[in-house]
């Protein structure tokens, strides 16, 4: 039985479809990229370069930037220290109630940040654990770290768990059969293979932490971080006064992502 050969028109349509799809893909991708870029461009050109340079080097802005970077770094380190073991445990164990724990981990991702701040304030505020310790748990850098860790650490746990899920358990078993103990097999086999996913989680956690506003506002209005300072500047002076602070925040966030890429550990490759 012979098959009919496509005619010239049909062959032309066949060649045209991939080209059309490629063009449509580039168009849609370009529109979204432009949508990401235009607000940043509007932010950069909102003021003259001289005025912008003066505003971003203001002591208040620099102090808020320092608070943000320090707190976000500490929050990310805390998330790594506790989140990576939690992610590994959730990935490698199966038990009744596991889904409940996963839901608990993801809860801060779906709660409005202000609600997260309210919950934390009830827990560690003057009516909670705050009355049991002399360490200031609110209105302090420690409070900022608590707020940022609560809302940002789930990004690390979720991405690290996904990375661990992608590592074959048989590789750990093979390492143990060659003399490695459980810790050694995880350190020498699983962690290197899951590294890219964990780094993606670190980047997302830092970016989320440094941009955290709602929970931080509820728990630690002082010392001011960049998001809180943006809000204060907007309320006190107006949108123009908030632009330079926002630009510093954008610059730090972009710089953190570029730093990961520059170190040769781009988690998205």
From Swiss-Prot:
Regions crossing the membrane: 26-46, 69-89, 100-120, 140-160, 198-218, 243-263
Phenotype seen when the gene is deleted: Mutation causes nitrate respiration deficiency.
Species whose genome carries this gene: Haloferax volcanii (strain ATCC 29605 / DSM 3757 / JCM 8879 / NBRC 14742 / NCIMB 2012 / VKM B-1768 / DS2) (Halobacterium volcanii)
GO CC, any one term: plasma membrane
Described function: Part of an ABC transporter complex involved in molybdenum import. Responsible for the translocation of the substrate across the membrane.
Lipid bilayer topology: Multi-pass membrane protein
Protein name, entry field: Probable molybdenum ABC transporter permease protein HVO_B0370
Compartments, as annotated in UniProt: Cell membrane
């Amino acid at each position: 039985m012979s098959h009919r050969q496509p005619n010239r028109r049909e062959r032309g349509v066949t060649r045209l479809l991939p080209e059309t799809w490629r063009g449509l893909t580039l168009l849609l991708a370009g529109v979204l990229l432009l949508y990401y870029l235009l607000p940043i461009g509007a932010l950069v050109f909102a003021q003259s370069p001289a005025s912008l340079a003066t505003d971003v080097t203001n002591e208040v802005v620099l102090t808020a930037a320092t608070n943000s970077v320090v707190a976000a770094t500490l929050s990310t380190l805390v998330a790594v220290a506790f989140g990576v073991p939690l992610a590994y445990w959730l990935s490698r164990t199966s038990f009744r109630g596991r889904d409940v724990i996963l839901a608990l981990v993801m809860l801060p991702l779906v709660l409005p940040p202000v609600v997260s701040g309210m919950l934390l304030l009830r827990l560690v505020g003057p009516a909670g654990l705050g009355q049991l310790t002399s360490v200031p748990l609110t209105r302090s850098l420690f409070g900022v770290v608590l707020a940022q860790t609560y809302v940002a650490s789930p990004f690390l746990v979720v991405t690290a768990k996904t990375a661990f899920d992608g590592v074959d358990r048989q590789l750990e078993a093979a390492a143990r059969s060659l003399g490695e103990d459980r810790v050694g097999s995880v350190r020498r086999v699983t962690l290197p293979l899951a590294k890219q996913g964990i780094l993606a989680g670190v980047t997302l956690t830092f970016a989320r932490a440094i941009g955290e506003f709602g929970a931080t506002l509820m728990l630690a209005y002082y010392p001011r971080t960049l998001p809180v300072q943006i809000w204060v500047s907007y309320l006190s002076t107006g949108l123009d006064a908030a632009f330079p602070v926002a630009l510093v925040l954008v610059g730090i966030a972009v710089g953190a992502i570029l730093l990961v890429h520059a170190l040769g550990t781009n988690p998205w490759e």
